[in-house]
Amino acid sequence: MAEITVRNGDVNLHVRIEGPADSPHLPILCVHGWPELGYSWRHQLAHFAGLGYRIAAMDVRGYGASDKPHAIAAYTLSQLAGDTAAVIDALGGRAILFGHDWGAPIVWHTALRHEDKVAAVAGLSVPHVPVGDIPFLALARQVYAGKFFYQMYFQPEGVAEAEFEADPQALAKVYFALSGGATE
């Protein structure tokens, strides 16, 4: 597996690539969700490379080996779509996009903003949702009032980070248990 860095503006993006560079097929680009990395796509990379596709998986900005800008404003869907378009350019300028979880809105948005670069989109677990009359966070506050909703939990800067950093081993056990990979 090859690993490259793609630069978009002042952000470096880590990308894993498998499959023949001279594939007759359009390349596939996989975009992960939360809390994942491009590594999450390793089995799909091996499978599609075995079928003769050039396939890549990026670490979205803020994750893994990609840069992590501090400013919240650095994480708009437009910027994430721009990152995805930059990786598509590095793969040859046009690609098929796979997106899972948070990666699905990223690939849908990339297709809308950079339609000349996107041949097809597979959005896994999250359908395309057009912009509504109410901003998402306002709607989530209404729908989940008085209930835990993880996306709302992460909105106030520093709260979740402090809780996670207080006991990283306990957090790791929770995630391993939820994934079915708990060893204790």
Regions of interest found by a model, annotated:
Residues R16-K68, H100:
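Conserved HGGG/HGGXW glycine-rich cap/lid loop of the alpha/beta-hydrolase fold
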